[in-house]
Amino acid sequence: MITFDEQVAIVTGAGHGLGRSHAIALAERGARVVVNDLGGARDGTGSSSEAAEGVVAEIDAAGGEAMANGADVTDLEAVTSMVDAAIERWGRVDILINNAGILRDKSFARMDLADFAAVVNVHLRGTAVCTKAVWDQMREQNYGRIVVTTSSSGLYGNFGQANYGAAKLGVVGFMNTLRSEGAKYDIRVNALSPVAHTRMTDELLPDEAKELLKPEEVTPGVLFLVSKDAPNGVVLTAGAGGFASARIYETEGIWLPPEERTPENVAARFEEIRDPEGQEEFTGGGEQSMKFLRMAMAGMQDEN
């Protein structure tokens, strides 16, 4: 059985929706939880402590232990104070779930760059700020579990969400690097791509889907990702009780000798370039570099 006894978790954006569900479930399984929520509107404006305090009250009433925090996830000083408060009260931080986010949807033609920057700031920079605030502590204790929250908009695209999609794929790149940097300290970093009915998605989902897409149907996946036996560097997709893994593959591709390196030859052989047979999954950028060097060396030997 997966439990979190004596562990300390921070969940951002935990006043509503997915974050609330994650925080309550962690507490039910023994974790001491920092319920972080700025308490702003869906577009990130305003602030209130009411939502975070409400979730803490729910956890307390069920016999759990939690504290509310209203730090803006983009403010390093405020986030550092949040982490310090958790360590002062409970002695450590074992788990960070980066869940906070905002939406400012418009087609790119109509999108103000200020709205682009605001969304990227919360989702991508906010994830980096919160992770930075716990990173040294997790390295020192040789243990940590971190989840970043991505989205189908980042993995596959969604009309009207250029800002959100850019940020959400950005956190996957962030995860891909930290999974390597944290491995020797037993810090495991994974991504969750949820499909759920929350206030963020309320206007995007038909009514008949909302009942199936409760946040609670996603939370079992994130609890696995922050458990002691968690994987490292995976993207777990989840919604309506379904769970899958999204992965990035690169095709085997082709090598062109110098005299054939023209755009016309790339076009002529593009289907061969895209052929998925023999595709592979890399765990670091250096593996891609070595692949092309091997192809070049083999190609030159064949020419000789």
Label each residue range with its predicted role:
Residues T3-V35:
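Canonical Rossmann dinucleotide-binding motif of NAD(H)/NADP(H)-dependent dehydrogenases/reductases
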